[in-house]
């Protein structure tokens, strides 16, 4: 177990795999071969938990043996308002998350996965070739941006306003349940796939991309 001060944001740099769970207390636990555990650093600055390999080295540079297995970092905190993954690391939240405002950023080739989110507002962005799966999101306001070749997937509930932007060759897939207004824009060869039901919908497109609304019902 690593000792850290309180935090409400998690920043993953490099290639670690982080498993997050909302809980009553703050904790950081690193599991794996000792040679790998020794190379992981976790420290808090300005309420941000930073997780990565020492001196920002990658696992390839460190020459871990094949039988060292997988390294996992388990993190808990009472609240989570921000997640940032830079590189090829993964951030996985397999349990429900309940917060006020949430910002999620993925830069690189990593993955971000949530089971379900309840919040007032969410802003999520993918830059690069990574994949973001937000699960079921109950929120009043949502903003989704994909730049590059990455993918974003979300199921929205009771959302009043949603803005979706794809620039490049990436994809955004959003399902709506009992939602208000949504605006979707594509610039490039990317795709936006919308389904479910909305009260109002608008879109704009520049390039060879596509906005698929075959399974979208506008009331």
What are these regions (language model features)?
Residues 132-219:
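Short, surface-exposed interaction patches in beta-rich subdomains
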Residues 1-86, 90-106, 116-125, 136-142, ...:
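Acidic (Asp/Glu) and glycine-rich low-complexity loops/linkers
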